[in-house]
Amino acid sequence: MKKKDFRFLISLLLFCTPAILSAQRIKGSDTLLPLTQELAEMYMKLNPQATITVTGGGSGVGISALMDGTTDLAMASRRIKFSEKLKMKQSHHEPCEVIVAYDALAIIVHPDNPVKQLTREQLEAIFRGKITNWKEVGGSDAKIVVYSRETSSGTYEFFKESVLGNKNYMSSILSMPATGAIIQSVRQTKGAIGYVGLAYLNPYVKALAVSYDQGRTYVYPSVENAVRKTYPVVRPLYYYYDKANEARVRPFIDFIQSAAGQDKTLNIGFIPITNSVQQ
């Protein structure tokens, strides 16, 4: 038996144990939604007495739910804000942070779009409304239709920070309530552009290579390039919980961070917190 397979088997056996409490609620980031759903199903198969419900809505929605006690774990693609942390502490709750994976953010366009790559500066100009036609970046003579996540999304905030340099998005940007809505809109609109987590990529949209050195080198979004640190748009993904609730949520968190959980993380299209991508 290979060392990796043995480690995976031991990891599974360790988590075939009774859950401390039978039900957990997890809410928040759409980026983390597919990963958490897959891992929750895997965990419940190993622990039939456990019940985990997972819903999206965005990082801000998840953290708000944690603050008002309507979720046990908040999924977030951004760090908790100082104001959110302060509000929890004022209510005598202590927020705890766990990194469960990393994610590469992919820039997507319609598959028929001839453009294959963009610089960070070009992306900034597009999402700020300074570049409005694809011919300005080597494409066809067609209007650029720009899609973004809503302001409650951690991905919205990360893109603003990493790509726009904390400058404002264009006022006429089309805000989507979920990542799936961006995928669907870009798929159906030939002049569209948007951004999604790597795990959401499919054959119906085209991911672009990105340059963060003013066009000298372009790198395609992939797990391998993210692990090698050659792809520039990578961020950590978080779970937040109330410290008083740690006994309830810790078994599932430990499972995610185990060898079995991290192998599944890689298979779904996220970057593990371990080095398991290196064979």
Regions found by a protein language model. Name each.
Residues 2-10:
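Bacterial N-terminal signal peptides that target proteins for export
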Residues 10-14, 34:
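Enrichment for repetitive, rod-forming helical segments
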Residues 13-22:
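Hydrophobic h-region of N-terminal signal peptides that target proteins for export
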